[in-house]
Every structure is written in C-alpha cells, then in structure tokens.
C-alpha cells in the first residue's frame, strides 16, 4: 500500500470530526466511499483511464486539511476584482471548499432557483439532495471520486426549476487561501429540471503561493429539453495540483456545452464522463490547454451514447512549450441500442519545443450499425513555411511564433458562446503566450 495509507489512517482517526461538521445526506455515503477507497487504492498507470498521470505520486505529500471548518479570514467580494467586462453575472465565491455566505450578490434570482451551500439545503430540503448526491459519481468506479466523497464536508448546490431560464450567467470563483500547504475537497451539484436553461462560469484562482492539492467532483443533471453551458477556467500557479471529475447526465432533447480552459497551473487532471439518457440530446465538449515550463495537463473523457439519435462533438487543443507534458484520452462509447448516433472527436496539438511531450489517444467503441462517427488527432510543430513568410515581412521570430500559436487555439475560443467571455479569453491567451500571465491578473490578493 502506497500513499493511500495516510488517507485511510486519517479517516479512521477523524471520521467523527468530519461527520460532525457536515450534513446527514453527505455522511450517509461517506463510510461506503471509505470502503471503496480502501479496496481500490490510488489507480496505478496500469489502469487505462489513468495511464498518463501517476496519481499516487500526486497525493504523496503531507497536506493539511481544515476538518474543523475554521473560518478563513477573507472577504472575497472586497478583495477579488477579476470580473469579465460587459458580462453581467450573479457572482458567488467558494473559499477553499466552503461556500461563502456572509455576503451574497445583490442580483435577484428567479423564484425557486437555489445557489447555496449543500449542507444548508440538505438541512432544509434533504429529499432534494438525496435524489441526486453521489448517484452518478459512483465511488465504486473511481478512487478519486471515492476519496472526495469520503472527505468532502460541504459543497455548492445549484438548482434551476422546470422551465426557468436564467438571464444572467452564474459565476463561481473558487479561491484557494491558506497559510500552510493545504488539501481541498470541493463538491458541486447542478440540477436543471425540464426546460430549464443556465450558464455557469467556474474560475479557479489562488490567493496564496502555498502548495495546494484540490480534488473536485461536479455532478450535473440536465433534464428533458434543458440547456446547460459550463465553462471551467483555471488560472492558478505552478504549486497547484488539481484533480477534477465531472459527471453529466442528459435527458431527451437536452443540450450541454462543456468547456475547459487551462491557462496556468501546476499539475491538472480533468475527467469528463457524459452519458445520454434520452433521445435527441446533443453535447459539445471543448478544451484549450496552454502549458510551458514543467506544467502538466491530462484530459480524459468518456461520452456514453446509450440511446438513439444523439449527437456529440469534442474538440481539444493543446499548445506545449519548454518541458510541459500534455495528455488527451477520449473514448466515445456507442451502445447497441444507440442507432443514428452522430459523433465527432478531434484532438489537435502543437508542440513548440523538442523537450515538450504530448500523449493522445482518441477511441471509438461502437456496437450499433447505423451511426456516423469519426475521430482523429494530430501532433505537430510550428509551420516552418508560415514562420518564414512572416519573417520575410519584418515580423520577429517571437512575434511570429505568438501569432501562429494564437491562431491555433483560436478555433476553440471562438466556440465560447458568451461573447464577453470569448473576448476576455482572447486577451488572456495573448498575454499567456507573451509570458505576461502567471496567474489571475485581476485579484488584489495575489502579491
């Protein structure tokens, strides 16, 4: 037994404390998650979905945990100024793994919409949480999900009732704040009832230069004819390790637009599991990764077509420089009954240095005979002819490289449907390529 032993011993010693600062609904699945974690341990690189990242090594250091739920001395509404210009949002904060409730946004939400702490809603309406919490994120199938379920003491709930359409995007800023190296276990539950529409922007930022280890589990339930836009933007620092598992279930004729953007990080491992539960649904999964120095980004996706007449489109692009390492493994599963499936999976990668490495593994697993599916990947370097053309016209080598890299990732950015966010990302990406963006540039906490 390797690094998992410290977490097993930790839970045995502190289970009572963990449960005393949480809700019964979360505690109800905690012991099973512990048993599942003990049985599985951290996945080795022999496990297919984890072959590109050594999870045991990531969890080996001894991080602190705030199990007593000590208050973090911070008012993010005063300190954080990193808003996206012209994007009107309902702004909320999660400090480490706690929903910040002392000051909530003044914008009014439609009747019945809930954006609140999981534990608080679980106390007032436990039935709502019980119907969805840990139903899709099964602890017996994934050790990281089991560890998160075992240790998470609170989380964020977003609930949008039937036929309610949110005019404003919900923006959630996840801030890491600590005076010591810290492990954070974050949980998010999103529920969109039939006909509901909502857009969410999750921004991961760090207020301190400590070492952070974050596990995150997001469960999103998208009802019939509902529409979910989910944007996940990471701008942390090189001392940050982030392991995120996202689970999405789509009912008939629903639509999901999932976007993950990694602009600055240390080590990032993202997993997306999306399943079609009803006919006529469609999803778009896009990813943009910019990594240099010794940064590492691993995206792993599974699109599960269980029913007929559904459409999925994936596009992930990486730009790697210096000694950065990237990995993409995408599997599209088309089951026997999923006739008339339409699926496209693409992973294109630009390796700008000889010392950078990219691993790519797109897969199609098809058991139906009336489908339209395709997948492909490319790994290449900067176009010498294009570089030569620009150099002849007086453009410096550095500027020419920047223009080619920016044009390469622009296809993904242009798919962002929130126009102000799209425009802001154009600026951030250019700054990132110029080396001017080391972490969130608009937060006064960053010193």
PLM regions and their residue ranges:
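Extracellular glycan-modifying ectodomains
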Residues: 400
């Amino acid at each position: 037994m390797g690094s998992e032993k410290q977490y097993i011993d930790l839970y045995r010693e502190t289970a009572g404390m963990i449960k005393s600062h949480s809700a019964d609904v979360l505690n109800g699945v905690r012991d099973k998650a512990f048993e599942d974690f003990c049985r599985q341990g951290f996945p080795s690189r022999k496990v297919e979905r984890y072959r590109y990242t050594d999870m045991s090594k990531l969890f080996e250091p001894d991080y602190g945990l705030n199990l007593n739920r000590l208050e973090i001395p911070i008012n993010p509404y005063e300190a954080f100024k990193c808003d996206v210009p012209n994007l009107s949002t309902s702004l909320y904060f999660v400090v480490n793994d706690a929903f910040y409730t002392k000051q909530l946004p003044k914008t009014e939400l439609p009747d019945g919409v809930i954006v609140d702490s999981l534990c608080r809603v679980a106390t007032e309406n436990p039935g709502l949480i019980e119907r969805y919490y840990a139903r899709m994120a099964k602890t017996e199938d994934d050790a990281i999900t089991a560890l998160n379920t075992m240790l998470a003491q609170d989380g964020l709930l977003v609930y949008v009732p039937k036929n309610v359409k949110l005019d404003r995007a919900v923006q959630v800023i996840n801030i890491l704040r600590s005076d010591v190296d810290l492990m954070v276990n974050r949980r998010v539950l999103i529920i969109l009832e039939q006909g509901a529409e909502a857009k969410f922007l999750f921004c991961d930022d760090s207020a301190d230069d400590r070492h952070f280890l974050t596990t995150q589990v997001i469960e999103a339930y998208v009802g019939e004819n509902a529409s979910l836009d989910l944007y996940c933007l990471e701008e942390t620092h090189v001392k940050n390790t982030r392991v995120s598992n996202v689970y999405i279930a789509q009912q008939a004729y629903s639509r999901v637009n999932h976007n993950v953007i990694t602009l600055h990080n240390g080590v990032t491992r993202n997993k997306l599991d999306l399943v079609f539960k009803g006919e006529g649904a469609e999803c778009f999964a896009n990813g943009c990764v910019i990594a240099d120095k010794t940064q590492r980004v691993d995206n792993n996706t599974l699109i599960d077509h269980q029913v007929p007449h559904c459409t999925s489109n994936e596009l992930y692009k990486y730009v790697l420089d210096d000694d950065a390492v990237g990995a993409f493994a995408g599997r599209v599963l088309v089951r026997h009954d999923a006739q008339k499936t339409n699926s496209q999976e693409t992973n294109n990668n630009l390796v700008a240095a000889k010392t950078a490495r990219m691993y790519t593994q797109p897969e199609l697993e098809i058991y139906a005979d009336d489908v339209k599916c395709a997948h492909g990947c490319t790994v290449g370097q900067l176009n010498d002819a294009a570089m030569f053309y620009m150099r002849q016209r007086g453009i410096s080598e550095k500027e020419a490289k920047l223009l080619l890299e920016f044009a390469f990732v622009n296809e993904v950015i242009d798919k962002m449907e929130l126009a102000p966010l799209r425009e802001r990302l154009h600026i951030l990406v250019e700054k990132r390529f110029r080396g001017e963006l080391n972490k969130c540039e608009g937060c006064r906490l960053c010193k």
